Amino acid sequence: FPIEEDKIVGGYECPKHXVPW
């Protein structure tokens, strides 16, 4: 699961995992 610190502001996707939110 993506780490909260890795989330783009707005919760769109995680740059490291690429998982959509």
Curated annotation (Swiss-Prot):
Its main location: secreted. Residues 8-21 form the Peptidase S1 domain. It is found in: Secreted, Extracellular space. It catalyses: Preferential cleavage: Arg-|-Xaa, Lys-|-Xaa. One of its GO terms (cellular component) is extracellular region. Keywords: Hydrolase, Protease, Secreted, Serine protease, Zymogen. Its EC number is 3.4.21.4. It is an enzyme of class 3 (hydrolase). GO terms for biological process: proteolysis. It comes from the Eukaryota. This is Trypsin. It comes from Protopterus aethiopicus (Marbled lungfish).
